[in-house]
Regions:
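Phenylalanine-focused residue identity feature
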Residues: 21, 31, 42-43, 76, ...
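Generic alpha-helical secondary structure signal
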Residues: 7-10, 19-25, 81, 115, ...
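Signature of the catalytic double-stranded beta-helix
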Residues: 1-57
């Protein structure tokens, strides 16, 4: 499968690639209800690159570090209003998306993804990679009514997720 690109240029874009469930069976099998998983993707941020502040089509993700280091940050923001809808580029095809890219933001939180994390992806967020190596994470999305940060968080806290 090809890598898709959210954005116009390699270094300030998020590169994504779907993963076959069989390839990550050992991870999916740790979930008590793997049937609630919608898809699993690799996300790549280029060396010395960034992913601009954006929100996803989905509301929640569990991101697992695959190749990361302490010069790569996940950043959350508050929107100051202005946003647009970026295209997804797959090869020479453009796909319209409901995701938003924010033009005016204030940073509210920054952390290094060195362990799995549950993210509220409906909030503006991005990535800064100040290292010489690409950053790669495995990102898990959830189906239908499970595409909810509070629902996944509650399942985790009540030991019903993993």
């Amino acid at each position: 499968r090809d890598w898709a690109r959210y954005g116009n240029q390699d270094h300030n874009s998020l590169h994504t690639k779907y993963v076959d469930f069989k390839e990550v069976e050992h991870i999916i099998n740790q979930f008590k209800r793997p049937e609630i998983i919608d898809n699993v993707k690799f996300f790549k941020t280029m060396a010395n690159g960034m992913v601009d502040p954006h929100s996803d089509n989905r509301s929640v993700a569990i991101n697992i570090p695959i190749r990361t280091n302490d010069k790569q940050s996940t950043i959350f923001y508050e929107s100051l209003g202005d946003y647009d809808n970026p295209n997804i580029n797959v090869g020479d095809k453009k796909i319209i998306t409901k995701a938003k890219r924010y033009n005016k933001v204030n940073e509210t939180q920054r952390f290094i993804l060195n362990q799995p994390a549950c993210l509220n992806t409906s909030l503006p967020h991005g990535v800064e990679n100040l290292s010489e190596s690409d950053r790669v994470v495995l990102s898990i999305s959830f189906k239908d009514e499970y595409d909810s940060f509070s629902r996944i968080n509650n399942l985790y806290r009540s030991k019903q997720l993993i």
